[in-house]
């Protein structure tokens, strides 16, 4: 797949999922207060990983991911309609550990005491 086309699909997927969650089109009560960070489409264009986070416990995290994965068909249909895709990638929602780690690192650095005598 063309890299420019791939980035366009990934960006539109992030935008579409975020807007559908914010606008309330996803009726699943497990899906709320979710941040969509990035998407990665496979080389063949058949699968897409969508990375998300939310402020919740580990137990609730599983429910959030389950709710998103159960609504993936709705996201896929909307994305296909917006981009006119012949093959719509199957969306798989994953917790964005990389984003969480970068936040933790930023917080750690800002809280680091400085010695100014």
From Swiss-Prot:
Keywords: Cytoplasm, Ribosome biogenesis. One of its GO terms (cellular component) is cytosol. It is found in: Cytoplasm. Monomer. Binds 30S ribosomal subunits, but not 50S ribosomal subunits or 70S ribosomes. HAMAP family: RbfA. One of several proteins that assist in the late maturation steps of the functional core of the 30S ribosomal subunit. Associates with free 30S ribosomal subunits (but not with 30S subunits that are part of 70S ribosomes or polysomes). Required for efficient processing of 16S rRNA. May interact with the 5'-terminal helix region of 16S rRNA. Belongs to the RbfA family. This is Ribosome-binding factor A. The gene is rbfA.
């Amino acid at each position: 797949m063309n890299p420019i086309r791939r980035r366009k699909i990934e960006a539109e997927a992030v935008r579409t999922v975020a807007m559908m969650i914010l606008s309330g089109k996803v009726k699943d009560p497990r899906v709320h207060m979710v941040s969509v960070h990035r998407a990665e489409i496979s080389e063949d264009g058949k699968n897409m990983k969508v990375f998300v986070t939310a402020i919740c416990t580990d137990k609730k995290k599983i429910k959030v991911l389950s709710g998103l994965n159960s609504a993936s068909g709705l996201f896929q249909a909307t994305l296909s309609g917006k981009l006119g895709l012949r093959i719509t990638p199957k969306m798989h929602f994953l917790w964005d550990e990389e984003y969480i780690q970068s936040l933790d690192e930023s917080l750690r650095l800002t809280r680091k005491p400085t010695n100014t005598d």
